[in-house]
A protein has these predicted regions:
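N-terminal chloroplast transit peptides
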Residues: 1-42
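Flexible, glycine/charged-enriched surface loops at secondary-structure junctions
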Residues: 252-255, 454-471, 505, 630
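Thiamine diphosphate
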Residues: 205-212, 428-430, 438, 445-448, ...
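Active-site diphosphate/adenylate-binding microenvironment
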Residues: 108-109, 113-115, 131-135, 466-516, ...
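Conserved short loop/turn motifs at secondary-structure junctions
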Residues: 321-326, 480-483, 537-539
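N-terminal alpha/beta PP-like core and its mobile active-site loop of ThDP/TPP-dependent enzymes
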Residues: 7, 35-43, 51, 55-459, ...
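A short, charged, Gly/Pro-tolerant segment at domain boundaries
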Residues: 257-265, 465-471, 634-638, 647
């Protein structure tokens, strides 16, 4: 099974707070003896790099290869080094002397303190050792060492989703950096703030195919909001500030800062303006018109038009995505809009949890594997209010046949699609919006709410009620007396039953295969007093299973629920439906997950029958919250996920569960 998800529920453990005073700028005299000793080692290391670089330049200058394109702006070995960037000399500009005499690694440490970083996820290596040496035994933040850099990236994602702070990743050059590409792409797709720092070979060796050299700036250009190589130690504080600013501005996302070894090992000799060393200061960053958010004040006329369209709508529908979760007030304002306007709500997969699923106005998830009634409602709504969603193909189905009623209403000027979006580039990218409202979704909702009027819409809710009754989520339960394996739905239902009392404190998120376990570890680090549950398929779990050892080593109390069907479930479903049951390389031969977990010091239990599920689930949930635990459920191999909208089909052309198909055929007969 390839599904991966993590689920967080609040428990009754008392919350503790730790008071920590951070010094925003430090003089040399304030540095601890550990740092003074570390600096001496770093200085000697910097001198060695300088000597080695000079020697290598003489030896190899006649055969130096052409640099890779992304590095062509760097100084070559045979050209004199670029002079240090010119700094303001006007006596009125205040200068920060606290970094003078510090190595690049020590400056990195101090900048993490100034940005109030509490946790870093990463893996050391030669090119990043000056930074790791500088943070050695630091008491100011915790470092989590995963078993693989991909794990570090996903841990930072989980941490960011729960804490609201950017996740910080620190890895070495070459393979260390490239192993974080998947988490960065995942974070870019889902709008998760990550700040990734990676080591790089010395600037004098760039372009020479040096040991573990990789053009990570070029490689990561398409999977980050912004990336940069720090070419001089005087740039380091500014680049770190820029990274945190860009990662959290507008639609959040990942950024990458490439740190050559001679920059992190070098020593700063000149003071820097406070403007570039102080977090939150104006950095005069260039703006990208396709990413720059627009404030609500510039959209007031469009907001009034949108409210008027909503008030006159007969069949409106709210389509909410992950963007609503970007602000703590987002779910509150969404609920207010739904109730005050009496409007049904459907959400994307990433938007699950943004609206109360037990509310009668909830249509649950929409799209390829969404509810049948949500898909039908989208096709018949005359006004669609899209909040923080981007109309991806899993939601729209066949675009030319998406939301036909809203398009007809738009042509008649009585309806259409209202798109609340923070990034201009996402407007009209897939579906044309009748009224695009740019800017922060929460701010714009706050401006529109006073203009919304209540309407009964009896006929609309009558249709929705009939769809819910006609097309519910269904499955056939297992029969333990016949030795049948558990259905995965039974596991999820039992989990839901035993955690129902925490309904108001649930955060659900999903990611790529391999995301679940490390993301849950990061989430638990960010919210140690919460219960964090990773719901994983066996195929997804296998990709990052070694991170159980990380949870064990650092006493991170995640709960890992593995649904083991010995198949790559989603792919197998396609092979059954569209490829004549030809299971091309989708069957898994798994290790004994219980023994594997125990080998890593993790308590593990297994369930084979539905009759023992309640007892084992109770043990799983009540296990020590400071230690990891694994529950393996052996589930039916051929259970599929329905409804399903086939690729290239419209939402109303969805495939229903066989029980509903048979019922529909009998009714028509």
């Amino acid at each position: 099974m390839s599904f991966t998800s993590i689920k967080f529920r609040a428990n009754s453990a008392p919350k503790t707070t730790t008071s920590l005073t951070l010094t925003r700028s430090r003089s040399t005299a304030a540095i601890s003896p550990v740092f003074l000793e570390a600096r001496a080692r770093v200085k000697e290391h910097a001198r060695n790099i300088s000597r080695s670089s000079a020697h290598n330049a003489v030896v190899s200058q006649t055969v130096r290869p052409t640099p890779a394109p992304a590095f062509q702006q760097l100084p070559s070995k045979i050209s004199p080094p670029n002079p240090a960037p010119s700094l303001p000399t006007h006596s009125d500009i205040p200068l920060d002397h606290s970094f003078v005499g510090l190595s690049g690694g020590e400056i990195f440490h101090e900048m993490m303190l100034r940005h109030d970083v509490k946790h870093i996820f990463g893996y050391p290596g030669g090119a990043i050792l000056p930074v790791f040496d500088a943070i050695y035994d630091s008491k100011h933040f915790d470092f989590v060492l995963p078993r693989h850099e991909q794990g570090a990236g996903h841990m930072a994602e989980g941490y960011a989703r729960v804490s609201g702070k950017p996740g910080v990743v620190l890895v070495t050059s070459g393979p260390g950096a490239t192993n974080v590409v998947t988490p960065m792409q995942d974070a870019l797709s889902d709008g998760v703030p990550l700040v990734v720092f990676c080591g790089q070979v010395a600037t004098s060796a760039i372009g020479s195919d040096a040991f573990q050299e990789a053009d990570i700036v070029g490689i990561s250009r398409s999977c980050t909001k912004w990336n940069v190589m720090v070419k001089d130690i005087t740039e380091l504080p500014r680049r770190i500030n820029e990274a945190f600013k860009i990662a959290t501005s507008g639609r959040p996302g990942p950024v990458l800062v490439d740190l050559p070894k001679d920059v992190t090992a070098g020593i700063l000799r000149t003071p820097l303006p406070f403007k570039v060393t102080t977090p939150g200061s104006t950095l005069d960053l260039p703006s990208n018109p396709l990413q720059t958010p627009v404030r609500a004040s510039s959209e007031l006329e469009l907001i009034r038009q949108a409210a008027q369209l909503i008030n006159q709508a007969e069949r409106p529908l709210i389509y909410a995505g992950h963007g609503v979760l970007g602000n703590p007030l987002g779910p509150k304002f969404l609920t207010q809009l739904a109730r005050e306007g009496n409007i049904p709500v459907t959400t994307t997969l990433q938007g699950l949890g943004v609206f109360d699923e037990t509310d009668p106005r909830s249509l649950h998830m929409i799209g390829m594997h969404g509810s049948a009634y949500a898909n039908l409602a989208m096709q018949q709504a005359d006004v669609i209010i899209a909040l923080g969603a981007r109309f991806d193909d899993r939601v729209t189905g066949k675009v030319s046949q998406f939301a036909p009623a809203a398009r007809t209403a738009a042509a008649q000027r009585r309806g259409g699609i209202i798109h609340f979006e923070i990034q201009p580039k996402n407007v009209n990218k897939v579906v044309d919006a009748s009224i695009p409202i740019l800017g922060d979704v929460t701010e714009n909702l706050a401006a529109m709410l006073p203009l919304i009027r209540f309407s009964e819409r009896a006929l609309w809710f009558k249709d929705i009620k009939e769809w819910k009754e006609k097309y519910p989520f269904v499955y056939v339960k297992s029969n333990p007396e016949k030795g049948e394996k558990i259905k995965p739905q039974e596991v999820i239902e039992e989990l839901d039953r035993q955690t129902a009392s925490y309904k108001e404190n649930v955060v659900i998120t999903t990611g790529t295969m391999g995301f679940g376990l490390p993301a849950a570890v990061g989430a638990k680090v960010g919210a140690p007093n919460k219960t964090v549950i990773d719901i994983d398929g066996d195929a997804s779990f296998s990709m990052t299973a070694m991170e159980l050892a990380t949870a064990s080593q650092f006493n991170i109390g995640v709960k890992v629920l593995v649904l083991n069907n010995e198949f790559q479930g989603m792919v197998v479903q396609w092979q059954d439906l569209f490829y004549d049951h030809r299971y091309s390389h989708t069957r898994m031969t798994n290790p004994d997950f219980v023994l594997l977990a125990k080998a890593m010091g993790v308590h593990a239990i297994r369930v084979r029958s539905a009759s023992e599920l309640p007892e084992k689930m109770k043990e799983f949930l009540e296990y020590d919250g400071n230690k990891p635990i694994l529950l393996e459920c052996i589930v039916e191999s051929n259970e599929h996920v329905f409804p399903m909208v086939p690729a290239g089909k419209a939402l109303h052309e969805q495939i229903l569960h066989s029980l509903l198909r048979d019922k529909k055929q009998n009714t028509e007969a």
